[in-house]
Design a protein with these regions (language model features):
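N-terminal accessory segment detector
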Residues: 1-103, 110-129, 136-182
Length: 182
């Protein structure tokens, strides 16, 4: 790479970043529109479906690309969210506790609900995101003992979204994937 191409690559990166910011703002606005015009239940269902589809399309291929598929399920799931979000520019924290338990945290400000938009989002909508993606990682990994426990949510007035992947001794019931414990 020469010095002459650096400004061109930087300009290209800024253009792509602008498109990403535009799509992100559109998505957030769309969710807020559904909340105000159709109600919380419809907005939660919409968010659930978007995130479940993304999870089904991206999670397993992403584990392979990131070199995580050999890890224990709880660790693989948490590291996937840590690395894939960092690559996408989202600040995430990760902590390994054991092969059966790994923690993730999305500190404020929350990327997904940028700025003051977070004030217009009911907790049910944020929980739908976790039900759509995080709760289905064990199913995708063919380990039905893997669940996700959410311990904090920004939309509920707490300092960030955080929780942990846990491999239980037995498969949790469908409605216990994820668990919301505070």
């Amino acid at each position: 790479m020469t010095a002459a191409t650096d400004p061109a690559q930087e300009a290209q990166w800024k253009r792509w970043r602008s498109v990403a910011d535009l799509y992100h703002a559109y998505f957030t606005g769309l969710i807020l529109t559904v909340v105000t015009r159709r109600g919380t239940a419809d907005a939660a269902e919409f968010v659930f479906r978007v995130f479940r589809r993304q999870q089904q399309e991206r999670f397993l291929p992403g584990l392979e690309k990131l070199g995580l598929s050999h890890l224990p399920p709880a660790v693989a799931a948490a590291q996937y969210h840590y690395l894939s979000n960092w690559i996408g520019g989202v600040h995430v924290e990760y902590m390994y506790e054991s092969d059966r338990k790994a923690l993730i945290r999305y500190p404020p400000p929350r990327w997904i609900w940028k700025g003051t938009a977070i004030c217009g989002l009911p907790g049910e909508v944020s929980r739908a995101m976790l039900r759509g993606w995080h709760a289905n990682n064990g199913v995708a990994l063919r380990d039905l003992r893997l669940g996700f426990v959410c311990t904090k949510q920004s939309v509920d007035g707490q300092d960030g979204l955080e929780g942990y992947y846990c491999e239980y001794d037995h498969p949790p019931e469908l409605d216990q994937r994820p668990v919301f414990a505070r």
